Structure formats: C-alpha cells, structure tokens
Amino acid sequence: MTVFALGGCTGAKNTFEIEDPRGLVSSATLRLCGSETPLAREADRLTLTRSIACEGDGEIRLVYEDGGSRHCIIGYVTPDAKQDWHFRADQSSCHHFT
C-alpha cells in the first residue's frame, strides 16, 4: 500500500522527442503548463522526459540553425497520464508521428 501511495505522487513520465536526422535544429523548448523547458540533444534527437502537472495543450518551439523557427503542436495533456509525443523536423515543418 505504501509503495502505491508513493508511486502515485510522482506522476507519469511523458516523453517529448524531436528527430532531427539532418541536423537542422539548434534548440527545442517545450512550452507547457505556463513554463518552458529545453529539450536535450542526444545525437540526432532532442528529448525530454517529465511528468505533467496541468490539463491543457502546448507546443515545442524549434529554433533552426538558420535562425528560423517552427512549432510542433502538443495535443491535450492531462496529469498522471502516460503520453509520448514524437516529431520529425524538416526544413519547413514539424511532423507528428506515432
């Protein structure tokens, strides 16, 4: 019982991932719940894993090496639900895939 109670307090971990196989993106920032959190680069991907403490929607703002920007739209999120968001960046847009 105690393990369940402690596990319930931590919240589900959600993954936000941008595939950047061509190295076009210089940075990516998750905007969600009134805050901004940068994604970390790992080879050809930018990733972030965190719990979500709000209901609503958000976006990941991509800043490209050439100074341009794009927005990856995050759909509706809810606290304590495991949700993973995967996108692929190209020169003109951000594509969501599962």
Question: Can you annotate each of these PLM segments?
Answer:
Residues 23-34:
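Short, ordered, surface-exposed loop/turn motifs in non-cytosolic proteins
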